[in-house]
Amino acid sequence: MSVDIHSEKILILDFGSQYTQLIARRVREAHVYCELHPFDLELAAIRSFAPSGIILSGGPKSVYEEGAPAVAEELFELGVPVLGICYGMQLMSRHFGGEVVPAGKREFGHAELLAQGTPGPLFDGFFLDGKSPVWMSHGDHVSQVPEGFQVAAGTANAPVCAIQNLACNLYGVQFHPEVNHTPRGEQLIDTFVRKICGCSGKWTPGQIIEDAVARIKQQVGSDRVILGLSGGVDSSVAAALIHRAIGEQLTCVFVDNGLLRLGEGDQVMATFAQNLGVKVIRVDAEDRFLSALAGVSDPEKKRKIIGGLFVEIFEEESNKITDARWLAQGTIYPDVIESAGAKTGKAHNIKSHHNVGGLPEHMKLKLLEPLRELFKDEVRAIGEELGLPHQMVWRHPFPGPGLGVRILGEVRKDYADILRQADAIYIEELYAADHYHKISQAFAVFLPVKSVGVMGDGRTYEYVVALRAVETKDFMTAGWYPLPYEDLARISSRIINEVKGINRVVYDISSKPPATIEWE
């Protein structure tokens, strides 16, 4: 008997916080389905959604500002548990008659939370010896708690940092439990969705696959599907999932655009022939892509050109396939987050994504995106459940535009050849030194600037390569990976000696934010 994986669900209302998608990630980690919607979702839509619980996100506004974001008045009367985070807690407090004022001292960063009174079930196991480290990011605070609420915790600078109304199952926290900097925050969100909201945890890899297979069959019917295969985790898992659902109705098109990693084209063909048994058509399109990118240096324009040309080629290939009606993509949730504000339109558009931008308005193929609601590690878990090779599943993310956004400025064939070699050496050394699987994403970047060097008795004037390696749990925030100096020295020496055209290697130690993981 199939399980309805959507029967238990959490509604997350987005007030514009950069961390909102992390809340969804933590709910998913508790094996509970959730959806993210704008804060002004109508009450009728909320009732129709029938959430097991509601989470109100943080946001950049102040609740006492004119036109400040607010929720439907009756939301708190629906009888479902509500957790307000940061702005969400302030909104809840003000709604019930509490007071919110500008803080005398703003809190940003680490803080020590101190338990007060008798913290309710939300805080089971959250405090050790009455204390818990948390991450703060607020300029306002609750100065007077509403009637019916009790203070559960505070800090030296803000006496009211957690509130609770046990009779109504309403909770608020001023800190951010969704970020990694709050060590036991993940546990707190798990407690909310599992213990307080009563969700049992039906959102598991096996059940997600079963549900996705059924949905794909229903959506596609007897139509044929064409999928753009890159060899990366997302398109590989999408191919395996769709193939399980519709078998020979799927044809994968592997576009060799001249912007892939060293030897990647041959590896992709060999891997899928051996492991998936999927029909794959290889298209050599290097000249078309490099010609289209000639003279283009703006990263957004490059992304649009690459995305548009991919779709154009897919359409050409689909015309050769009888009854091809669908274009499948490996779009995942973080792609949608960065490009479209997670469907809310409330988040700032940092950069367009290859899978969700650059599509022609009158595309002849309908889009099939079976992974678009999944985070990266959910995709990996599904890939393993589907039996894909471990090395394929755990390969670092590679952008859809490929080396096109790892070559700063104009893309040229000689630049791509240099970068391919440098990147291959870098990744090879990370494997050899047992760093690769400890790093979330690592790659080389080609900088189209020259610097003076000395090799032998001669002067050189050659290009620069930057190395990037980051650690992250969710790709929403990331820290740079501290490679040992001796490893950096060895990698640099190999690249400079083995790659013609490079005489300088630098290491990127920027975190996200303020920098993004990719340079473009």
Swiss-Prot record:
Binding residues annotated for ATP, in chain numbering: 230-236
GMPS ATP-PPase domain sequence ranges: 203-395
Matching Pfam families: GATase (PF00117), GMP_synt_C (PF00958), NAD_synthase (PF02540)
Active-site residues, record numbering mapped to chain: 86, 176, 178
InterPro entries attached to this UniProt entry: Class_I_gatase-like, GATASE, GMP_synth_C, GMP_synth_GATase, GMP_synthase, GMPS_ATP_PPase_dom, NAD/GMP_synthase, Rossmann-like_a/b/a_fold
Reactions it catalyzes: XMP + L-glutamine + ATP + H2O = GMP + L-glutamate + AMP + diphosphate + 2 H(+)
Keyword terms of this UniProt record: ATP-binding, Glutamine amidotransferase, GMP biosynthesis, Ligase, Nucleotide-binding, Purine biosynthesis
GO molecular function per UniProt: ATP binding; GMP synthase activity
Pathway in which the depicted protein is active: Purine metabolism; GMP biosynthesis; GMP from XMP (L-Gln route): step 1/1
Superkingdom of origin: Bacteria
Alphabetical list of Gene3D superfamilies matching this protein: 3.30.300.10, 3.40.50.880, HUPs (3.40.50.620)
GO cellular component assignments: cytosol
Protein EC: 6.3.5.2
Residue ranges constituting the Glutamine amidotransferase type-1 domain according to the UniProt record: 9-202
Quaternary assembly: Homodimer.
Annotated HAMAP family: GMP_synthase
Function field: Catalyzes the synthesis of GMP from XMP.
Name listed for the protein in its UniProt record: GMP synthase [glutamine-hydrolyzing]
